[in-house]
Amino acid sequence: MPKKNDFIIVGGGLVGCLTSLILSKKNYTICLIEKKTFKHIISDNFTPLSLTINTIHFLKKHDLWNSSYIKASEIKELTVKLFNSFNIMRFCSDDLYGEELGSVVDKSSFLSYLIDNCKKCKNINVVDEADVDIESITSPIKLSQTDSKSTITGDYLIITDGADSQFAKNLDMGSLSFNYDQTSYMFNTNYQHLSKGAFQIFSKKGIFAILPCNDQSVSIVASIYNEFIDDFAF
């Protein structure tokens, strides 16, 4: 008889890992299932992920923030240029009790940090490189591994395997889709004069952001409306 978990979580990305860790701190038992290899990610690339100060407070509250492991750059000042206006707005951390406005983190290093914590947690059983099928969605929920006779059981099932989740389709879960008719691009480049500052520009052709990676480089993110794609030499 397989051990029954409180929660079964399918999908070991940022949402799946974070959900598992928060539930584990409430002393629930979790089986975290990931289709790919669940391991520390080694990468020299910087993929920016913006976190608000409230998100960082939440992570710190649950002991899930460690600046020595996570590649992060604080945002102390945000400059916003509005569409169809000459107005420029500036937000400064000095106006908010001296706290940073947020941070730009490297997605890979943040996910690696969460993965390492999941693997060390006694309340989380990680099953990776696994394809599973749903046998029963009534409690206890049962999932079976397609390449073995193993069965995973739990009281609750949480699906976090992405927007195109096959599990959600199989369970006929309702969803809403929004088409912004945009294509996004991201570039990293050397630039030394944007220490802890970020820019966001709204224009007729799209939304542009300049985000600090570190003291030596920035990420440029452009979300272009598809009708204007040909105006740019990306």
How should these model regions be labeled?
Residues 22, 113, 117, 188:
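Rossmann-fold NAD(P)-dependent oxidoreductase module
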Residues 8-10, 22-47:
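Glycine-rich FAD pyrophosphate-binding loop
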Residues 57-61, 72-170, 178-183:
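Conserved N-terminal helical subregion
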Residues 45-70:
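N-terminal glycine-rich dinucleotide-binding loop that anchors FAD/FMN and/or NAD(P) in oxidoreductases
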Residues 163-234:
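Conserved FAD-binding catalytic core of PHBH/FMO-like flavoproteins
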Residues 16-17:
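N-terminal Rossmann-fold NAD(P) dinucleotide-binding loop
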Residues 2-7:
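Extreme N-terminal starter segment of soluble prokaryotic enzymes
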